[in-house]
Amino acid sequence: MAKQIKFGEEARRALERGVNQLADTVKVTLGPKGRNVVLDKKFGSPMITNDGVTIAKEIELEDPFENMGAQLVKEVATKTNDVAGDGTTTATLLAQAIIREGLKNVAAGANPMLLKKGIAKAVDAAVEGIKEISQKVKGKEDIARVASISANDEVIGELIADAMEKVTNDGVITVEEAKTMGTNLEIVEGMQFDRGYVSPYMVTDTEKMEAVLDEPYILITDKKISNIQDILPLLEQIVQQGKKLVIIAEDVEGEALATLLVNKLRGTFTCVAVKAPGFGDRRKAMLEDIAILTGGQVITSDLGLELKDTTVEQLGRARQVKVQKENTIIVDGAGDPKEIQKRIASIKSQIEETTSDFDREKLQERLAKLAGGVAVIQVGAATETEMKEKKLRIEDALAATKAAVEEGIVAGGGTALVNVIPKVAKVLDTVSGDEKTGVQIILRALEEPVRQIAENAGLEGSVIVEKVKASEPGIGFDAYNEKYVNMIEAGIVDPAKVTRSALQNAASVASMVLTTESVVADIPEKETSGGPGGAGMGGMY
């Protein structure tokens, strides 16, 4: 296919036009007085959002050269979202500022490769500065502040802080769409997996259609149980002790299932059978998790263990097991805490080593089930459009709080970036020529978030930037109340990881744009007009 090529200044200007179209669309959402953007969807109602990465993903431009510029900045937003989960608008804005300032200098004859070196040195100094001023997250209040700022909503902030407190940092918090108007939090204590009872005749509470067994024994196996003779010796031991039994197996069917149900209906013996969670290797790992949590053993041929030889000592124990139609919850397993900690450490190391996002997500779920529990935030609103917008904000806020726990918090509202300017300025003494210009480009870009937040609030950005620069470190501009405050004391905070990732990703892509000398794109095909209409077939109505 034939290509069209642009060179030098013309190529860079085309990329810049694309960058500006995307960044100008995204940057109106920044800050407490930022506006929303409406995205047209081919199906269903339009989507209203102020999430930078969601907006960026929707943008495709007609001109192929401009579109390349837009796609490059889209990568800044996506990468920042992947690493930190928030700060995508800030990252896009910083990339635009670095590209704008950089291209001015390239047009004036600066060497792009030296500019790139200067930019890299300045960014390293800024990242060091951010690490130095970051503060550890202390308790629930700090988490609520981070989440409130990210979601622009104090109620959501409190909700996320509650969830984080209940399920600990290793727990999993999921966001689901609710059927009701309100947004609420549901905590699942203990280990939950998505398999329910094999037969509804096993329920102990017919009103709620669930089986609740207190202090039961738990048989964990990867075998299929169809012959009652296999487990008869074990059942006799349990009946003698007057205990209840939960069976977690590949399946329970035929004669074995019938016998268990008859005994349950007669009231001689209570037993609930549940299919094992997961598939393949993941099933084996999850059964092992359950065994460690409950202090039992997985009865599997891999270890040479047979069902008919199983004794009560090989079974797991728990304070309570609750089995619903599609879920099973094991509360307070009787496993050895040291063994559980070992298992948690092993899963954590697997999370660090894996390269697959899917595997990582599944490992995180397993970790949460062993370590803390699962919290579900049910998002409700009057309309579907509002609910989707709210769900996006909650997901962003969740990611921001996790980032804050990892690397601490810094003053929000773009203040932290202005506060590291003196540290970056020291780099000027160590460089010269075009490298020095590269450092100055970053010094100018670091002011951009404060300037944009002020402009979105209808104020003159430059005046506010100068006042923040002249103030003590940590003093910033509260755009919501339009006054200068100590940002951390006022609860206006950003996760250090979000601020750092935004700057690093913006500088990385912007440097690529500055060092571009030619761009190559396909020549758009001219659409041919349709062929002549065919004559109708006779005799057809």
Swiss-Prot record:
Its EC number is 5.6.1.7. ATP binds at residues 29-32, 86-90, 413, 494. CDD domains: GroEL. It comes from the Bacteria. Keywords: ATP-binding, Chaperone, Cytoplasm, Isomerase, Nucleotide-binding. One of its GO terms (biological process) is protein refolding. The keyword Protein biosynthesis does not apply. This is Chaperonin GroEL.
